[in-house]
From Swiss-Prot:
Coiled-coil segments: none
Native source species: Porphyromonas gingivalis (strain ATCC BAA-308 / W83)
EC numbers for this chain: 4.4.1.11, 4.4.1.2
Subunit structure: Homotetramer; dimer of active dimers.
Protein name: L-methionine gamma-lyase
Reaction it catalyzes: L-methionine + H2O = methanethiol + 2-oxobutanoate + NH4(+); L-homocysteine + H2O = 2-oxobutanoate + hydrogen sulfide + NH4(+) + H(+)
Binding annotation for pyridoxal 5'-phosphate: Y59, T60, R61, G89, I90, S209, A210, T211
Function: Catalyzes the alpha,gamma-elimination of L-methionine to produce methanethiol, 2-oxobutanoate and ammonia; methanethiol (methyl mercaptan) is considered to be one of the main causes of the oral malodor in periodontal disease and may also play a role in the pathogenicity of P.gingivalis in that disease. Is also able to catalyze the alpha,gamma-elimination of L-homocysteine.
Length: 399
């Protein structure tokens, strides 16, 4: 199928057929090119490839057919010109940010972030002379107030991890782009391009932890950066090649490409299950509050309808009784897996205050609006009645 015809096709068709590459034996499934290096026909050809005068592969850290295939697939789904793959979500995020900033530059970021992103921005970049200002991106005026003459990047997660706050991507992009040289980078892991496409709303760069929904089966660690072709070349040739070395393996690229073929149908079922679970949680007496974009009670329900095609499958909720109640709930579940990460076929649950965000001070958690009783739930693909029965058993133990 020609690329121009594929671009006019539906999402599932692009997810299945996008990035197809020719192979010598006519294999329907993309072969795995499990090699560290590639052979040149002549010394002259090797010279041309290193000089960038001829397309082709040199060394898998610099590129591999499996990585190229899945990069093209994701770029097509996100509506970007190109994509770069990485060995983890943080590998993608750090590679993407390193090529945007230098010592003396400034970043504005959401104050509620994935724990490792928070650490990279606040504890990592500061060692190299990059300043970071954290703001509540639910209020675009806070972003505008934080931008300085040396600001180079606005970094967003929406929905935010772990409390599900949304950011109006278009509003923030409109503000950022009034200032010369300021780019907007959005972590689209929670939504995937099936639910939200930040580039269409004005973002310059999209990052993903492909460990989550893109792969969808809990057996890969990987990440992506999507954006303009010139920028992605810099991410690959400077960010990944020289600064982080965080290249994706061919086998992981193969698994992600295979997983993405079912992305649409998986996301639809994830979201159906999550809607039903959220409605159950909202009625349980041990639950103080539920934060889910698909509930009319969600404070940003209208924004969710505006920029998300579906509400997603991540739920945050607060249990009555604080930290001890949160831990007790974790220890009284049998089907839901007590584990970090998200986007797997299995339902995963965790208590940030005692788990993922335990290395941070109570003040840092409070600044990110992570309460002691907050629970994060990644709703899986099990029968929803079984998920609810397990949650009911655990929550009933708190009464």
């Amino acid at each position: 199928m020609k690329k121009e015809d594929l671009m006019r096709s539906g999402f599932a068709t692009r997810a299945i057929h996008g990035g197809a590459i020719e192979n010598a034996f006519g294999c329907l499934a993309t072969p795995i090119y499990q090699t560290s290096t590639f052979v040149f026909d002549t010394a002259e050809q090797g010279g041309r490839r290193f000089a960038g005068e001829e397309d082709g592969y040199i060394y898998t850290r610099l590129g591999n057919p499996n990585c190229t295939q899945v990069e093209e697939k994701l770029a097509m789904l996100e509506g970007g010109e190109a994509a770069a793959s990485a060995s983890s979500g943080i590998g993608a995020i750090s590679s993407a940010i390193w090529v945007c900033v230098k010592a003396g530059d400034h970043i504005v970021a959401g104050k509620t972030l994935y724990g490792c992103t928070f650490a990279f921005l606040t504890h990592g970049l500061s060692r190299y002379g990059v300043e970071v200002t954290l703001v509540d991106t639910r209020h675009p005026e806070e972003v505008e107030a934080a931008i300085r003459p040396n600001t180079k990047l606005v970094y967003l997660e929406t929905p935010a991890n772990p409390n599900m706050y949304l950011t109006d991507i278009k509003a923030v992009c409109d503000i950022a782009h009034k200032h010369e040289g300021v780019r907007v980078m959005v972590d689209n892991t929670y939504c995937t391009p099936y639910i939200c496409r930040p580039l269409e709303l004005g973002a310059d760069i999209v990052v993903h932890s492909a460990t989550k929904y893109l792969n969808g089966h809990g057996d890969v660690i990987a990440g992506f950066v999507v954006g303009k072709e010139d920028y992605i070349k810099e991410v690959k040739l400077v960010g990944v090649k020289d600064l982080t070395g965080a290249n994706m393996s061919p086998f992981d690229a193969y698994l992600i490409s295979r997983g993405m073929k079912t992305l649409q149908i998986r996301m639809e079922q994830h979201c159906r299950n999550a809607q039903t679970v959220a409605e159950f949680l909202e009625k349980h007496p041990a639950v103080e509050a539920v934060y889910f974009p698909g509930l009319p009670s969600f404070p940003q329900y209208e924004l969710a309808k505006k920029q998300m095609a579906l509400p997603g499958a991540m739920i945050a909720f607060e249990v009555k009784g604080g930290c001890e109640a949160g831990k007790k709930l974790m220890n009284n579940l049998h089907l839901c897996s007590l584990a970090v990460s998200l986007g797997d076929t299995e339902t995963l649950i965790q208590h940030p205050a005692s788990m993922t965000h335990s290395p941070y001070t109570p003040e840092e958690r409070a600044a990110s609006d992570i309460s002691e009783g907050l629970v994060r739930l990644s709703v899986g693909l099990e029968n929803v009645e079984d998920i609810i029965a397990d949650l009911k058993h655990g929550l009933d133990s708190l009464i």
